[in-house]
């Protein structure tokens, strides 16, 4: 009984936090699912969350690759520009805001990250190829981070 009460208390705390953020529980789980799809390192979940929160605040498209992977049949692949143009309510490159629902079953770490994003000004991130990401506040720095990633990828072939 004590464990059930503790578990229910956690649920209500998370629901209160979602309300503080202006999100429904469904929206929190949807955002958490994107974080789950994006984060390879637990230490980056709240930073990735901050990017999405910051984008939502300024009505910027989320441009989340996991949402594209979700709508493409088959195993994950390197995305093409054509993939980014697929017509779907889940395509966060084409649509503003969150997709209609979760794209996977997020773990508790991603749910916590969705509820408690790191306080940053980051608007962009790019994978580094080792599971980590480079986070940036503007498009110029983001393009530079992408350029460096491509150079390093070529070197490591």
What are these regions (language model features)?
Residues 6-157:
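Bacterial extracytoplasmic/cell-wall-associated proteins, especially those involved in peptidoglycan
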């Amino acid at each position: 009984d004590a464990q059930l009460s503790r578990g229910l208390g956690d649920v209500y705390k998370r629901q209160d936090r979602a309300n503080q953020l202006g999100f429904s529980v469904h929206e929190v789980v949807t955002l958490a699912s994107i974080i789950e799809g994006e984060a390879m390192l637990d230490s980056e979940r709240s930073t990735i969350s901050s990017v999405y929160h910051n984008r939502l605040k300024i009505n910027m498209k989320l441009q989340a690759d996991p949402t594209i992977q979700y709508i493409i049949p088959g195993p994950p692949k390197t995305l093409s520009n054509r993939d980014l143009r697929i017509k779907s309510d889940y395509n966060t490159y084409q649509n503003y805001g969150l997709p209609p629902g979760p794209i996977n079953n997020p773990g508790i770490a991603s749910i916590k990250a969705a509820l408690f994003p790191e306080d940053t000004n980051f608007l962009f991130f790019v994978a580094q190829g080792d599971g980590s990401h480079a986070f940036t506040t503007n498009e110029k720095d983001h393009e530079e981070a992408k350029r460096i990633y491509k150079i390093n990828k070529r070197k490591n072939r």
